UniProtKB/Swiss-Prot annotation:
The gene is GATM. InterPro entries: AmidinoTrfase (IPR033195). It comes from Pongo abelii (Sumatran orangutan). This is Glycine amidinotransferase, mitochondrial. Transamidinase that catalyzes the transfer of the amidino group of L-arginine onto the amino moiety of acceptor metabolites such as glycine, beta-alanine, gamma-aminobutyric acid (GABA) and taurine yielding the corresponding guanidine derivatives. Catalyzes the rate-limiting step of creatine biosynthesis, namely the transfer of the amidino group from L-arginine to glycine to generate guanidinoacetate, which is then methylated by GAMT to form creatine. Provides creatine as a source for ATP generation in tissues with high energy demands, in particular skeletal muscle, heart and brain. Its EC number is 2.1.4.1. The keyword Acetylation applies. The modification Phosphoserine is found at S46, S49.
Length: 423
């Protein structure tokens, strides 16, 4: 528009055109020079950045340090939890809904403080022995960093002390070459991931995929403040309706509510895992993996592996006290359903966070070797009849903190390939 207007002005328009052209030429020349210099600088910066990127990520090893598709392929590397500095969680609604009524006075008295010192000392010794035996069986063992879980922390929505780093199965799940951090539902576990970060960063630098699921705010809306605690009948009724102490306010799940069988992963809606959390996993893992929701006759579900533990291709231990509602799905696929014997743990042994059925919470080292409690003779005999060698370890005091061998571990690498066992 400026050029047209100048042309209409006669000779002064021509002079204007000449003037503007000369200025434009100088401007363009300067722009080209600056652009060229900028391009050179950007190219150099890009080269430096690429070199830095290459230095950070290359060369990648041929074999990823993280690789596991199921619960039974030959175990090569595992994370084993720590009992050190374990703290009794504050007695909040989500803890109350997940614990036995006879232990509520214990939580009310000791919440926010360390578990009994002598008991922890015994548990630490048991887990050290477990680690030594795993190493003797040829398995690489990694441990989380020691942390003082008694420290109080505060977010905009709540304040709490911590719990422990005893159960890596609760917070971590490996699917193929990816390690996923779970968005757990207990407020006392909000910062539990910190104990595992140095291990996971090492795996990431060596080529593994690392995903952290959306962390919940754990605001009051995540919990049903009126959840019926005392009535088992009400709990059964609500569980059948898919209602638990956690709401659908935001996704949450414990990794221990998922169990893997190649392309098929089975999950339960529980007191700590909601449907939004399961849906997040379903979308995240699709289309290579299929996430199936299964349920059990269980008024207080929390973690699937002491209820439904897959120990081999098409072989599952199914808790007789908590039968699976979808068991026909597995029978039609030709799976072998094994009913484990009743556990023999004494009634007076403290189980602050679990049931006696930790006896079936075993760790498969491969299809023919299983790590099992040294005290649980009936289930040892069951495995021996199946042709599976039992590796006996005593972790009775470690059981009190809420887990068996499967809970106390996260299998990082198993020697195997992705297959389908349900088709």
């Amino acid at each position: 528009m400026l050029r047209v207007r100048c042309l209409r002005g006669g000779s002064r328009g021509a002079e204007a055109v000449h003037y503007i052209g000369s200025r434009l030429g100088r401007t363009l020349t300067g722009w080209v020079q600056r652009t060229f210099q900028s391009t050179q600088a950007a190219t150099a910066s890009s080269r430096n950045s690429s070199a830095a990127d290459d230095k950070a990520t290359e060369p990648l090893p041929k074999d990823c340090p993280v690789s596991s598709y199921n619960e039974w392929d030959p175990l090569e590397e595992v994370i084993v939890g720590r009992a050190e500095n374990a703290c009794v969680p504050p007695f909040t609604i989500e803890v109350k809904a997940n614990t036995n009524e006879k232990y509520w006075p214990f939580y009310q008295k000791h919440g926010g403080h360390y578990f009994p010192k002598d008991h922890l000392k015994k548990a630490v010794a048991e887990i050290e022995e477990m680690c030594n035996i795993l190493k003797m069986e040829g398995v690489t063992v990694r441990r989380p960093d020691p942390i003082d879980w008694s420290l109080k922390y505060k977010t905009p929505d709540f304040e709490s002390t911590g719990l422990y780093s005893a159960m890596p199965r609760d917070i971590l799940i490996v699917v193929g070459n990816e390690i996923i951090e779970a968005p757990m539902a207990w407020r006392s576990r909000f910062f539990e991931y910190r104990a595992y970060r140095s291990i996971i960063k090492d795996y990431f630098h060596r080529g593994a995929k690392w995903t952290t699921a959306p962390k919940p705010t754990m605001a009051d809306e995540l919990y049903n403040q009126d959840y019926p605690i005392h009535s088992i009948e009400d709990r059964h009724k609500l569980a059948a309706q898919g209602k638990f102490v956690t709401t659908e306010f935001e996704p949450c799940f414990d990794a221990a509510d998922f169990i893997r069988a190649g392309r098929d992963i089975f999950a339960q809606r529980s007191q700590v895992t909601n449907y939004l959390g399961i849906e997040w996993m379903r979308r995240h893992l699709a289309p290579d993996y299929r996430v199936h929701i299964i349920s059990f006759k269980d008024p207080n579900p929390m973690h699937i592996d002491a209820t439904f533990n897959i120990i081999g291709p098409g072989i599952v231990l199914s808790n007789p006290d908590r039968p699976c509602h979808q068991i026909d799905l597995f029978k039609k696929a030709g799976w072998t359903i094994i009913t484990p014997p009743t556990p023999i743990i004494p009634d007076d042994h403290p189980l602050w966070m679990s049931s006696k059925w930790l006896s079936m919470n075993v760790l498969m080292l491969d299809e023919k070797r299983v790590m099992v409690d040294a005290n649980e003779v009936p289930i040892q005999k069951m495995f021996e009849k199946l042709g599976i060698t039992t590796i006996k370890v005593n972790i009775r005091n470690a059981n009190s903190l809420g887990g068996g061998f499967h809970c106390w571990t996260c299998d990082v690498r198993r020697r195997g390939t992705l297959q389908s066992y349900l088709d």
